[in-house]
Amino acid sequence: MARLKEIYHKDVMQKLRSDFSYANIMEVPKIVKVVVNMGLGEAIQNVKILDSAAAELAAITGQKTVITKAKKSIATFKLRQGMPIGCMVTLRRAKMYEFLDRLMNVSLPRVRDFKGVSAKAFDGKGNYTLGIKEQLIFPEINYDAVDKIKGMNITIVTSAKTDEEGRALLKYLGMPFRN
């Protein structure tokens, strides 16, 4: 079992149950999935960027990426409907917990001048989105093989009903929030 999942079952569930006084154990919020998205506008001119981004995202997450395509045409960006413009990965179960563990304990502390992540990036329904400016903070990425620095969005989807519950869940799991 993943280390973070063990922590969730042993400690976090009891803490959340006492903090929010849930009547049923099934009411306790849990992490449903983690979506890692890399949007690449430069892929319009150079499709090779998308291949390297997909390979890097697969190395970071340990799962095959899905190429995302443009939903509609935008003439000012020279974008046609159906053109590949990014890649994403949806993590669930064991890979999700392992990725979150590596993100919170290894990757985020490697960010320059890291003081913690913002506690305000919740969407109103308990889900948390985190933006990362460069993929080099992940130890799986070889610094010499990187052709261009690319950022990514990481969305942690929880079953929490409010932001307060979602924040408590992530805080107890070890997310380094800024004070």
Curated annotation (Swiss-Prot):
Keywords, in A-Z order: Ribonucleoprotein, Ribosomal protein, RNA-binding, rRNA-binding, tRNA-binding
GO terms of molecular function: rRNA binding; structural constituent of ribosome; tRNA binding
UniProt GO cellular component terms: ribonucleoprotein complex; ribosome
Biological processes annotated in GO: translation
Record-linked HAMAP family: Ribosomal_uL5_B
Subunit architecture: Part of the 50S ribosomal subunit; part of the 5S rRNA/L5/L18/L25 subcomplex. Contacts the 5S rRNA and the P site tRNA. Forms a bridge to the 30S subunit in the 70S ribosome.
Protein name in UniProt: Large ribosomal subunit protein uL5
Species this protein is from: Pelobacter propionicus (strain DSM 2379 / NBRC 103807 / OttBd1)
